[in-house]
């Protein structure tokens, strides 16, 4: 049975086509701020238990859509699935975040790196994509909203692979980049090939848009960012499938702290650039001059404010962009685990309400 999208507003906005309102989804929209997520995680036993079992991943992917009229679903997974598939031994210690048992530090470590067999090592992800697509679709073949697939960027993956986990200053990975750029470029080359293959596998399984999360690109200096992050994002984008089943598959790139390099990101070949909250959205729209759509960019901590303040800040973001195509509303980074769910409901409602008013010319 042929599938049709009931709500394709998100995809049309990414392609800079006119929409009746501004679509919204939220980074980490399926997460610890939702009681139902925590209940499912408890059943799964761990974060990796959630991410590596398609039934659980499907369940938590759909949870925010049951609460809020969001305009897209995003695959529940983790950005570190690729290095885990490379054999680095990913674990999430309680209260400590991700850790790798086998960090990549030496020439011998780098020499052992290889692009994983996506089907053999990451089949649980593509299985989840297929299962989520089925769950989003009713008996008549009508799909509620599009599904987003994603990966970490080559540089961001390298940060975790070399540091062995998170870091405050990234001194180990940066030291390698400056002292042994040959090793760093070898890691990044393998990562770029793996990210492209991984995203293409998600597209073939049913992801209708894909996003590259360059969470730590902003830790680099100007110049180093272009060499070690941007160039490899460009390589990934060049290898992506941009059509599947007769439909365009838009690509989004997001560098946290990357406002300085907006024009560079817009020139990578992506359809949209994600922005954090430090960037003026109206000026960003002028800077990209219609070449790409923009996604963002409310400060996530605003969701701790009273409802009327949340609504006012949402209106400010929408007013900054103005009545132009090509905007997807999002946070400037992932939603905090401490966010009250009822505040998310206020945000989603105001984005839909006020953007419709802007389109109609009333704007209030």
UniProtKB/Swiss-Prot annotation:
**Record-level GO cellular component terms:** cytosol
The residues listed in the UniProt record as binding substrate, with positions renumbered to this chain, are 28-32, 78, 160, 215, 333
Q: Which pathway is it part of?
A: Porphyrin-containing compound metabolism; protoporphyrin-IX biosynthesis; coproporphyrinogen-III from 5-aminolevulinate: step 4/4
Cell compartment(s), UniProt: Cytoplasm
What's the domain of life for this entry? Bacteria
Q: Name one Pfam family in it.
A: URO-D
| Enzyme type, top EC level | lyase
The disulfides recorded in the entry are none
Q: Could you tell me the EC number(s) of this protein?
A: 4.1.1.37
GO MF term set: uroporphyrinogen decarboxylase activity
Q: Name any Gene Ontology BP term.
A: protoporphyrinogen IX biosynthetic process from glutamate
Task: Give a short account of what the protein does.
Answer: Catalyzes the decarboxylation of four acetate groups of uroporphyrinogen-III to yield coproporphyrinogen-III.
HAMAP family on file:
URO_D
Q: What family does this belong to?
A: Belongs to the uroporphyrinogen decarboxylase family.
Q: Subunit composition?
A: Homodimer.
- Write down what this protein is called: Uroporphyrinogen decarboxylase
> What is this protein's gene name?
hemE
């Amino acid at each position: 049975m042929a599938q049709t999208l009931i709500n394709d507003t998100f995809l049309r906005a990414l392609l800079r086509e006119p929409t009746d309102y501004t679509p919204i989804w939220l980074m980490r929209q399926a997460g610890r701020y939702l009681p139902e997520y925590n209940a499912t995680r408890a059943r799964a036993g761990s974060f990796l238990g959630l991410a590596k079992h398609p039934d659980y991943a499907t369940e938590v992917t759909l949870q925010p859509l049951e609460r809020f009229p969001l305009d897209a679903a995003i695959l529940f997974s983790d950005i570190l699935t690729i290095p885990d598939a490379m054999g680095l031994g990913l674990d999430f210690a309680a209260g400590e975040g991700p850790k790798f048992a086998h960090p990549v530090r030496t020439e011998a470590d780098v020499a052992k790196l290889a692009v994983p067999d996506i089907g053999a090592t990451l089949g649980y992800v593509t299985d989840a994509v297929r299962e989520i697509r089925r769950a989003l679709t009713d008996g008549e073949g009508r799909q509620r909203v599009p599904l987003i697939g994603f990966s970490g960027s080559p540089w961001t993956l390298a940060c975790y692979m070399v540091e062995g986990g998170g870091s405050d200053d990234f001194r180990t990975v940066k030291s390698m980049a400056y002292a042994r750029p040959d090793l760093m470029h070898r890691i990044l080359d393998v990562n770029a090939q793996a990210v492209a293959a991984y995203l293409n596998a998600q597209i073939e399984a049913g992801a209708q848009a894909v996003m590259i999360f360059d969470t730590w690109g902003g830790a680099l200096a100007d110049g180093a960012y272009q060499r070690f992050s941007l160039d490899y994002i460009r390589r990934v984008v060049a290898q992506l499938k941009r059509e599947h089943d007769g439909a365009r598959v838009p690509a989004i790139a997001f560098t946290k702290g990357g406002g300085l390099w907006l024009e560079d990101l817009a020139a990578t070949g992506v359809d949209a650039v994600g922005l954090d909250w430090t960037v003026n959205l109206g000026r960003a729209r002028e800077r990209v001059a219609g070449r790409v759509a923009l996604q963002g960019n409310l400060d996530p901590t605003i969701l701790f404010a009273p409802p009327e303040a949340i609504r006012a800040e949402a209106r400010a973001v929408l007013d900054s962009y103005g009545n132009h195509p090509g905007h997807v509303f999002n946070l400037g980074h992932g939603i905090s685990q401490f966010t009250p769910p009822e505040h998310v409901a206020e945000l989603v409602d105001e984005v839909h309400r006020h953007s419709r008013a802007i389109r109609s010319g009333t704007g209030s």
